[in-house]
Amino acid sequence: MLKKANKLRGNDGYIIDSLGWAYYIKKNYTEAELFLQQAVELLPLDPIINDHYADTLWMLNKNIQARYIWNYILKLDDAEQELKDNISKKLIFGLAEKL
C-alpha cells in the first residue's frame, strides 16, 4: 500500500518516510536508508524523519553520521521533549539492536 501511495504522490516526504520506516522495521536497512535520505531532503526540519534516518544510519554502522543527525535534532524547535530525551539516550548508549 505504501509503495502504491509513493507512486501516486512521489514527492510526499511523509509517505517516503513511512515507506523507509517499513523497510527499517523489516531490518532492510540499506533500502530504508535510500527512502529516508530522500524524505530528509524533502522535509529537513522534521525531527521524526531525521530520527528515523539517524536510526537507520546507526544500524548500518554509520555511527558518526547518526550522531551528527541526532545532535542536529536536539537543536530543532519542533522536536518534542520526549523525542529529545530519547535522542539524548541514543547519544550516550547508541541503539541496543545492531546488525
What is each residue range found by the language model?
Residues K3-K7, Q38-E41, K75:
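Conserved structural position within tetratricopeptide repeats
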Residues S18, H52, N86-K90:
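Canonical tetratricopeptide repeat
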Residues G13-Y14, P47-I48, Q81:
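Helix-start (N-cap) detector for alpha-helical repeat units in TPR-like alpha-solenoids
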